[in-house]
Amino acid sequence: MSADFGADRVPRPREGVSGERFGSDFIVLDADGRTLRGLNATAVRVWQLCDGTRTARSVAEQVAKEYSMDARQVLTDTLRFLTDLARLGLIDELQEVR
């Protein structure tokens, strides 16, 4: 895994990692007990779009479109979030899409 998640990398949850909604909270957890709690609505949407079929850039573009947000800022925030998820061992980075 690289130090920072690249915009052209394809994120997907690692095997055994899932995202669950509990009431108003969304929790990402894995079999080893690592959890990430308190995701805001845009972070939840990023997680939902990380299905192994889209680049990080296309995930950010979709979120920016859905939430009418600045695309550059959403890309920056998305890459930071994905880098954190990768460091926690919650997502895998697939090959770059060319």
Task: Please report, for each region that a protein language model flagged, where it lies by residue.
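Long, low-complexity, charged/polar intrinsically disordered regions in eukaryotic proteins
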Residues: 1-31
